[in-house]
């Protein structure tokens, strides 16, 4: 896998979590996905919500560090 350890996953999480809230919110996820690849197009609001929902296992509208770990290790 891309991430070698849980520490790598946590480091990635905290890079995406721009406001250091402990959660990845929709705007942070959208910014990360847009910047992930130089040629990436902007995602629609619906696409961003779909990505967010895929990782948001507790339905609070945000991705916590545990949810992020589960998402990237899946």
UniProtKB/Swiss-Prot annotation:
UniProt superkingdom: Eukaryota
The entry's keywords: Allergen, Calcium, Metal-binding, Muscle protein, Repeat
Residues binding Ca(2+) 2: 56, 58, 60, 62, 67
GO molecular function: calcium ion binding
Pfam family of the protein (one): EF-hand_7
UniProt cross-references to InterPro entries, sorted A to Z: EF-hand-dom_pair, EF_Hand_1_Ca_BS, EF_hand_dom, Parvalbumin
Keyword Metal-binding among UniProt keywords: yes
EF-hand domain: residues covered: 4-39, 43-74
A cellular component annotation (GO) from this entry: cytoplasm
Keyword Electron transport: no
Annotated binding of Ca(2+) 1, by residue: 17, 19, 21, 23, 25, 28
PROSITE patterns attached to this UniProt entry: EF_HAND_1 (PS00018), EF_HAND_2 (PS50222)
Function: In muscle, parvalbumin is thought to be involved in relaxation after contraction. It binds two calcium ions.
Leftover remarks: Is regarded as an important allergen.
Family classification: Belongs to the parvalbumin family.
Official protein name in the record: Parvalbumin beta 3
Organism annotation: Macruronus magellanicus
